[in-house]
From Swiss-Prot:
The keyword Ribonucleoprotein applies. One of its GO terms (cellular component) is cytosolic large ribosomal subunit. HAMAP family: Ribosomal_uL6_B. Part of the 50S ribosomal subunit. Belongs to the universal ribosomal protein uL6 family. This protein binds to the 23S rRNA, and is important in its secondary structure. It is located near the subunit interface in the base of the L7/L12 stalk, and near the tRNA binding site of the peptidyltransferase center. PANTHER family: 60S/50S RIBOSOMAL PROTEIN L6/L9, LARGE RIBOSOMAL SUBUNIT PROTEIN UL6M. One of its GO terms (biological process) is cytoplasmic translation. GO terms for molecular function: rRNA binding; structural constituent of ribosome. This is Large ribosomal subunit protein uL6. The lineage of its organism: Bacteria, Bacillati, Actinomycetota, Actinomycetes, Pseudonocardiales.
């Protein structure tokens, strides 16, 4: 039995879960999300309001999808009730970020400013010229947008300059030694 998949999902107050066949819809104070669950897995509501994710058999495919499906539904419940946030930091001389409306404008050492537009359901917030955060209800989308921003100028292993996640440790390399 999957250690993650067998755990029931508690639904906080103010969150409504609707199960329609393989489609699970979660509505909460921050918005609503829809997820289609893979075929052998079933999602049911318990008598006390908890959500149970079950698998029909112990085949390899069912086992692999069991924990995944439970995590996807749990991430939806947490997203519509609390939301997700990913913080990023910018290191380097002259590297900075500026909020222009809902967009972010980066100065990252290129000959031009880099503008990033938020997709639907994502908000950007800046805290000074070197700190920013990506917020939203969809965990996958928040992580993807944060990774795209980090990819604009990945941290340099020699000087540590670039965009990194808050608290991320960059493995530094020693430069070549002169004679």
């Amino acid at each position: 039995m999957s250690r993650i998949g067998k755990l029931p999902i508690t639904v906080p107050s103010g969150v409504e879960v609707t199960i329609d066949g393989q489609d699970v819809t979660v509505k909460g104070p921050k918005g609503s999300l829809v997820q289609r669950i893979a075929e052998p897995i079933t999602v049911e509501k318990d008598d006390d309001g908890a959500i149970l994710v079950k698998r029909p058999d112990d085949e390899r495919n069912s086992r692999s999808l069991h924990g995944l499906s439970r995590s996807l539904v749990n991430n939806m419940v947490v997203g519509v009730s609390q939301g997700y946030q990913k913080d990023l930091e910018i290191h380097g001389v002259g590297y900075r970020v500026q909020q222009k409306g809902s967009n972010l404008e980066f100065a990252l050492g290129y000959s031009h400013p880099v503008v990033v537009e938020p997709p639907e359901g994502i908000e950007f917030a800046t805290d000074g010229p070197t700190k920013l955060s990506v917020k939203g209800i969809d965990k996958q989308l928040v992580g993807e947008i944060a990774a795209r921003i980090r990819k604009l100028r990945r941290p340099d292993p020699y000087k540590g300059k670039g965009v990194r996640y808050a608290g991320e440790n960059i493995r530094r390399k020693v430069g070549k030694t002169g004679k």
